[in-house]
């Protein structure tokens, strides 16, 4: 997906026929169901492709086929929660891709909560408004991650497992951490006032604790943008998907029976 360039179809031209649109939307729905349940590794790709559901072009269908090639190849992947004598306390990694979409320059929020070394809650979504700086995009992402952290704490308490310490949130943005801690506040951040005080409230009430992490170690990076081959493999290994380890590379598209079936369906709908 890193090399696939997707742009909206110019209006009012309609390249896709109704059968293609229906097939595309059905496939996106299936991929989204899988992504929400057990596959954070495809979250960004699914979100990106879903933006073109109303009028997919052949480029979008080709990218969708590539996504399903990967899904078929990694069908045995799954989340593994390994029993530990000293269970790991949940942590969160949060990241943002600033103005990554050239069509509207809206940034993407990505966060992942992990326990026992395995994800259990994640999100990859476009932000509601255009951020005017990297710090603003990262801070908006941290705001949504902190809201989810608060909900996780409340849910855990309701089922009888209250947290005994703040939930740790890791970000690779020093500017964002400075804003959240109150050491970097001036006129340029005034419009972030509501989010600013809500995150500080969570910190002051010991619901969350904010930490810095290097960008190359941020596990939420895969949720915000397409990654190069090596980086993508590293991120998937972080998520503890495969019992036997992550292979060097996926097979050529169309090698398996499942992939051939997906390919033939796409070709039939296109004809």
PLM regions and their residue ranges:
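Structured nucleic-acid-interacting core domains from mobile-element enzymes and related host factors
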Residues: 69-94, 163
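Conserved pre-motif C helix in the palm subdomain of viral-like polymerases
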Residues: 19-44, 97-100, 108, 135-154
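RNase H-like nuclease fold core
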Residues: 31, 92-135
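Beta-strand-rich binding-surface signature
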Residues: 3, 32, 76, 90-91, ...
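Retroviral integrase
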Residues: 39, 95, 169-172
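C-terminal reverse transcriptase regions that engage the nucleic-acid substrate
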Residues: 1-78, 214
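Acidic, metal-ion-coordinating active-site neighborhood of RNase H-like domains
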Residues: 66, 93-102, 220, 224-227
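RNase H-like nuclease module associated with reverse transcription
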Residues: 52, 87-89, 125-271
């Amino acid at each position: 997906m890193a090399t696939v360039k997707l742009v909206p179809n110019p209006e009012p031209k309609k390249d896709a026929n109704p059968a293609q649109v229906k097939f595309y939307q059905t496939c996106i729905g299936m991929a989204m169901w899988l992504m929400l349940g057990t596959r954070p590794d495809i979250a960004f790709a699914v979100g990106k492709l879903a933006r073109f559901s109303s009028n997919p072009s052949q480029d979008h269908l080709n990218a969708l086929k590539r996504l399903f090639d990967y899904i078929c190849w990694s069908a045995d992947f799954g989340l593994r929660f390994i029993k530990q004598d000293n269970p790991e306390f949940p942590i969160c990694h949060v990241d943002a891709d600033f103005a990554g979409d050239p069509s509207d320059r809206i940034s993407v929020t990505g966060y992942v909560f992990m326990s026992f070394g395995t994800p259990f809650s994640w999100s990859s979504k476009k932000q509601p408004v255009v951020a005017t700086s990297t710090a603003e995009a990262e801070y908006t992402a941290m705001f949504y991650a902190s809201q989810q952290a608060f909900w996780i704490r409340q849910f855990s308490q309701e089922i009888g497992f209250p947290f005994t310490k703040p939930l740790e949130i890791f970000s690779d943005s020093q500017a964002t951490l400075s804003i959240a801690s109150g050491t970097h506040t001036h006129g340029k951040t005034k419009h972030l006032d509501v989010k600013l005080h809500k995150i500080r409230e969570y910190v002051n009430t010991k619901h969350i604790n904010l930490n810095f992490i290097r960008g190359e170690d941020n596990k939420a990076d895969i949720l915000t943008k397409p990654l190069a081959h090596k980086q993508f493999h590293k991120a998937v290994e972080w998520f503890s998907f495969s019992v036997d380890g992550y292979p060097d590379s996926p097979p050529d598209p169309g090698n398996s029976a499942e992939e051939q079936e997906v390919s033939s369906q796409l070709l039939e709908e296109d004809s």
